[in-house]
Curated annotation (Swiss-Prot):
This protein's name: Ryncolin-4
Taxonomic path: Eukaryota, Metazoa, Chordata, Craniata, Vertebrata
Biased composition (Basic and acidic residues): 86-116
Protein's organism: Cerberus rynchops
PANTHER family, A to Z: FIBRINOGEN/TENASCIN/ANGIOPOEITIN, FICOLIN-3
CDD domains from the UniProt entry: FReD
GO cellular component: extracellular space
């Protein structure tokens, strides 16, 4: 046994130690029986000797890792953090689709009954034309409602500044924004835009020109802004059955000559109604709608060319003005009731 090894020696000592120690060596194995007779005696006679603990041994090799344990339950939710600063505002998103039309609203309550009156008293039948409006104090150019008859009202453009005012404009060309190469039905009802170009409508022109004698004035302006005009003592057209036949009085005055008298007595023609007396279809050949004969000396409903054009007589032409190869920038045709004395300018 190495000197640093731990050991225990237990000696059983008899209750009487005298002489026993010396005799121990002479006895045999059979003489080693203890002299104590009771467990108590033997126990209290034991002597236990213990040395100091030895040096710890070298650590063993680590064992292998055990298997991964089960996932624990989630911990409780923590308190909300402090709100951060607002971010930069993003760009506006694309416009959404148009929503469905809403439900129709409830019908309103019935209004109070108006006062009874005769038709002659209720309608301002004295406002039959632009001249009547001028005499009532209306001095601005613009659109007004008039009553050519007690049963009929219409919205018309009044020129209150040219040659004393009171002119009702039924045709205007100024920028080419409206197509004038149209069918019969369009010219019958009228077309165009209030703010630019329009034709009032042959049915309305017939009604207006058959309620008293109407003078006619035509104003033109070229692309150099040189203004010219022509006036006629009277102007009227027939109804649709008469194919809106033109009846024109004498040429009165102006600085662009007379290029309308040739059309006097002729029916109106459009690209789908050939009422001229030519072997060709004048409205189709000259891209307009007019009182064509064989075919024209004027074509104020022709194509909107910008000044000089190579094509023949299919623009806004006035023969005694700038001829068949020049299309005017501006043109209008207007009427007002005939006066006993007329001053033109």
């Amino acid at each position: 046994m190495k000197p640093w090894a731990a050991f225990h020696l237990i000696f059983l000592v008899a209750s009487s130690l005298e002489g026993e120690v010396s005799n121990y060596g002479t006895r045999g194995a059979q003489d080693t029986e203890p002299t104590c007779r009771t467990e108590h005696q033997c126990t209290r006679d034991k002597i236990i000797l213990q040395s100091q603990p030895g040096i710890p041994g070298i650590p063993g090799v680590p064992g292998t890792n055990g298997s991964e344990g089960l996932k624990g339950d989630p911990g409780p939710q923590g308190p909300p953090g402090i709100r951060g600063p607002d971010g930069i505002r993003g760009e506006a998103g694309p416009k959404g689709d148009k929503g469905d039309q809403g439900d129709k609203g409830d019908k309103g309550d019935k209004g109070d009954k108006g006062e009874d009156c005769n038709l002659d008293d209720c309608l301002p039948t004295e406002v039959r034309n632009c001249q009547d409006l001028l005499e009532r104090g209306e001095t601005l150019n613009g659109w007004y409602k008039i009553y050519p008859t007690e049963e009929v009202s219409m919205l018309v453009f009044c020129d209150m500044s040219t040659d004393g005012g009171g002119w009702l404009v039924f045709q205007r060309r100024q920028d080419g924004s409206v197509n004038f190469y149209r069918e019969w039905e369009s010219y019958k009802k009228g077309f165009g835009r209030q703010g630019s170009e329009f034709w009032l409508g042959n049915d309305k022109i017939h009604l207006l020109t058959n309620s008293g004698t109407q003078q006619l004035r035509i104003d033109l302006a070229d692309f150099e802004n040189i203004h010219t005009f022509a006036t006629y003592s009277s102007f009227s057209i027939g109804n649709e059955t008469e194919k809106y036949k033109l009846t024109l009085g004498s040429h009165l005055d102006g600085n662009m000559g007379d290029s309308l008298t040739l059309q006097n007595g002729r029916s109106f023609s459009t690209k789908d109604r050939d009422n001229d007396v030519s072997h060709i279809h004048c409205a189709v050949n000259f891209k307009g709608a007019w009182w064509y004969r064989k075919c024209h000396e004027s074509n104020l409903n022709g194509l909107y060319h910008k000044g000089k054009h190579a094509t023949y007589a299919n623009g806004i032409n006035w023969l005694t003005g700038k001829g068949y190869h020049y299309s005017y920038k501006y043109a209008d045709m207007k009427i007002r009731p005939q006066k006993s004395e007329t001053t033109v300018s």
